[in-house]
Amino acid sequence: MKKNLLDKELLNDAKWLMPGLQIKRWFILIFLGSLFITIGGMIFFNLRPVYFTMEIIRKVATHVNTDLIALIIMLIGIICFFKGWQKTNLTILDVKDSKAKGNLLESLYRRRKLNRGPKIVAIGGGTGLSMLLRGIKNITNNITAVVTVGDDGGSSGRLREEMGVLPPGDIRNCIAALADNEDLITKLFQYRFKTGEGLEGHSFGNLFLTALCSITGDMVRAIKESSNVLSIRGRVLPSTLDNMKLAAEYEDGTIVHGESNIPEAHKKIKRLFTEPENCKALEDVIAAIKDADLIILGPGSLYTSVIPNLLIKEIADEVVKAKAKKIYVCNIMSQPGETDNYLVSDHINALYKHANSDQLIDAVLVNDFLPQNMAQKYEEAGQLPVRLDSENIHVDVVEKKLIEDSKEGLVRHSSYRVARAIYYWYRKSQRKDKDKK
């Protein structure tokens, strides 16, 4: 038993030598610093163990004072020692400050591994985007979430009209999803006041972001400050700072204004557009897309969460031109008033139409497993599974079980399964590209 414990301790000690921790270099620097300090001190005090070293120094530098050489060596050693000590402490404190779970070594390794992960840009809105972020934050820390700002309903809509701020609801959900202490932050940000004049119906997170926006001067700075306070992995950006509102034209020629009104007509949507038409993309969003290794569209409401971002021409154009791998996560079920009877190809064609390009994505991720009892329950409510029609799709089709195991019978994407499927496809695509070269 004692031997096993000893072996375990030795194994844990050996883990400090694993590649990727970026801490061994500072240990080596501390060791070299200590060595230089020791040698310099021995030369300065003329100790016998360095007799041969002193003889070499005298021959090489006959006109230089030996004590001066000793002091220089000691100074170099002191600088190396304290630099290594400082960097080691900063590395460890960085992990401790993040409130990461697990022991220090595991947290350090996880943080370093995530810091070297792919640069991912996730574009969308609503609950779909926050679900996705919960999964991909376990793959990389290099995340940029681009959030639509067309929401005009509920608490977000009221704050937008009364305070003149960008709708904070979807932004709030994304910040909570990327926070280290996700459960607590989500409960806090989602807390909705049930009483109180002016407060009733508002969520704490929406009010928090609105207050920060008032203090800092704009929503981007408010998001940045709240992200720092909550130690989130990655960053969250609105797609535009313009007061963007959505409008839809239906197949019968009628037009409706406002995101919350679009599904209510229960008509087939011909096109979606923004008011004003030429909204300007945030510069940081464009820079992130250009620098991305992987761009993910969806999941989420096709016409009110995903496509609104592509109506900003700069964003759509940059996604099309981007060298990154690009994948669309298709919804599992149809959405009443938006995508009734839609096939997977209908989703893709709607994206192409509004982005003005059929080069928008390289692949589509679809769910391939749905229990009959779940499908029947949703069918009674007017929702059908989005059926795959591979013959009409001209990009890679990735079929995986994506639904979350639910005792309540709810059809929801599993953040873990979606993130894993996307990452496997991304790595496979990288290997294919290398083989071609």
Model-predicted segments: where are they?
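Glycine/threonine-rich flexible loop motifs
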Residues: 302-312, 374-382
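Short glycine/serine/threonine-rich phosphate/pyrophosphate-binding segments
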Residues: 127-133, 155, 304-311
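A short, basic/flexible loop-to-alpha-helix module at the beginning of a structural domain
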Residues: 102-116, 280-286
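C-terminal functional extensions of proteins
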Residues: 2-19, 341-437
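Charged helix-capping and loop-helix junction motifs
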Residues: 309-316, 342-347
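Electropositive, gly/pro-rich neighborhoods at or near active sites that engage anionic ligands
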Residues: 2-99, 148-266, 423
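A short helix->loop->beta-strand "cap" motif at the edges of active sites that frequently abuts
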Residues: 140-141, 322-326
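Active-site gating loop/helix substructures
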Residues: 238, 242-301
